[in-house]
């Protein structure tokens, strides 16, 4: 290899590393936003359930049997949202670990 070839190789690697870092940073930001979104969804769902239960129990002579089905449906939704939240947090943790490794490798070079 000539010095120019080495220089081009180093520049290419440098650009690849910068692109990977930018992608990692973007992915981290997206996962943080996902986590905030899923937490907000869970909060609003739980608040809605509490309000439904409160409204139903205060109305006299109205059967509460539909409430049981609604609670099961909402519970399934909450479990799904919690799973999505866990998935997003796991992805964020993985991306943060990858980013830390990338920065460590860059510092050694």
UniProtKB/Swiss-Prot annotation:
**CC terms in the record's Gene Ontology section:** acrosomal vesicle; axonemal A tubule inner sheath; axonemal microtubule; nucleus; outer acrosomal membrane; sperm flagellum
Q: What is its main location?
A: cytoplasm
BP GO annotations: cilium assembly; flagellated sperm motility
Summarize what the UniProt record says about post-translational modification: N- and O-glycosylated.
Keyword vocabulary terms for this entry? Cell projection, Cilium, Cytoplasm, Cytoplasmic vesicle, Cytoskeleton, Flagellum, Membrane, Ubl conjugation
Q: Where in the cell is it found?
A: Cytoplasm, Cytoskeleton, Cilium axoneme; Cytoplasm, Cytoskeleton, Flagellum axoneme; Cytoplasmic vesicle, Secretory vesicle, Acrosome outer membrane
Q: Does the keyword Iron apply?
A: no
Q: How does it sit in the membrane?
A: Peripheral membrane protein
Q: At the top level of its lineage, which domain of life is listed?
A: Eukaryota
Subunit comment? Microtubule inner protein component of sperm flagellar doublet microtubules. Interacts with TEKT1, TEKT2, TEKT4 and TEKT5. Interacts with CCDC38.
The family line of this record is: Belongs to the tektin family.
Its biological purpose: Microtubule inner protein (MIP) part of the dynein-decorated doublet microtubules (DMTs) in cilia and flagellar axoneme. Forms filamentous polymers in the walls of ciliary and flagellar microtubules. Required for normal sperm mobility.
Supply the name of the protein.
Tektin-3
- Recite the lineage of the species: Eukaryota, Metazoa, Chordata, Craniata, Vertebrata
> Gene name on record?
TEKT3
């Amino acid at each position: 290899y000539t010095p120019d070839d080495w220089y081009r190789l180093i520049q290419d690697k440098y650009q690849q590393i910068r692109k990977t870092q930018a992608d990692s940073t973007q992915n981290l930001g997206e996962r943080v936003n996902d986590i905030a979104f899923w937490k907000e969804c869970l909060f609003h769902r739980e608040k809605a359930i509490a309000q439904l239960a409160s409204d139903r129990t205060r109305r006299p002579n109205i059967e509460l049997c539909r409430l049981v089905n609604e609670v099961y449906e909402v519970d399934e939704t909450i479990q799904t949202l919690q799973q999505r939240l866990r998935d997003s947090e796991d992805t964020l943790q993985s991306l943060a670990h990858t980013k830390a490794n990338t920065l460590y490798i860059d510092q050694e070079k």
